[in-house]
Swiss-Prot record:
Bridged cysteine pairs (disulfide): none
Superkingdom of the source species: Eukaryota
SUPFAM superfamilies: N-terminal nucleophile aminohydrolases (Ntn hydrolases)
InterPro entries associated with the record: Ntn_hydrolases_N (IPR029055), Proteasome_alpha (IPR050115), Proteasome_alpha-type (IPR023332), Proteasome_asu_N (IPR000426), Proteasome_sua/b (IPR001353)
Subunit structure: The 26S proteasome consists of a 20S proteasome core and two 19S regulatory subunits. The 20S proteasome core is composed of 28 subunits that are arranged in four stacked rings, resulting in a barrel-shaped structure. The two end rings are each formed by seven alpha subunits, and the two central rings are each formed by seven beta subunits. The catalytic chamber with the active sites is on the inside of the barrel. Interacts with ntc.
Chief subcellular location: cytoplasm
Residue(s) carrying Phosphoserine: S248
Location of this chain's protein in the cell: Cytoplasm; Nucleus
Cellular component terms per the entry's GO annotation: cytosol; nucleoplasm; nucleus; proteasome complex; proteasome core complex; proteasome core complex, alpha-subunit complex
Tagged with keyword Nucleus: yes
Record's protein name: Proteasome subunit alpha type-3
Amino acid sequence: MSTIGTGYDLSASQFSPDGRVFQIDYASKAVEKSGTVIGIRGKDAVVLAVEKIITSKLYEPDAGGRIFTIEKNIGMAVAGLVADGNFVADIARQEAANYRQQFEQAIPLKHLCHRVAGYVHAYTLYSAVRPFGLSIILASWDEVEGPQLYKIEPSGSSFGYFACASGKAKQLAKTEMEKLKMDMRTDELVESAGEIIYKVHDELKDKDFRFEMGLVGRVTGGLHLINPSELTEKARKAGDAANKDEDSDNETH
């Protein structure tokens, strides 16, 4: 712990002399240690992809999932602490259910993002609680609004994106996503997500990982699907092929 944080990092309600809230900085560090999570908007779909690090071969395959279905057309992926992710996913589902009960329709993603971001921000204001060690990516698609993608940071700030990333390889993933077209078809979207996750995975530090994917769009009938078998396998094959091509290029040079 740096000396500048001494005495100013015990509470989320206290600023340091240089205007920082160290508890939020520490929450961001928890996100940076997590496996990489990305979201990409296409022409008529949004894909969420996760590099789920396997810390033990004794876990069941679906243990510690980082992708959630919030509403039938809304998906959520998280980087950071899995337990925090489960908690916030339940909060988001409750917000969606309350909206549907009151207005008899699905909650707009922008409204859900605003509500969840406000909840996350509230946990940065009081000394009795700690900020969530979590970065949240929300995705949806419908006939009226089309594809939508938002990200919420541990501070509670939120923005809309064409593509975004969180986790340990965030910067490398962003560099790869900046090369993409912004109006990709669903099959291109899925393959690009697989290629990026496999490319940013660091085999020296984290040997085993499981690729997981969430997809919502016209091809899914407006439903958010987690690990749709055919498309997920397509993404994994594209990622594996891209990884092998990169390895062969490195050997050549």
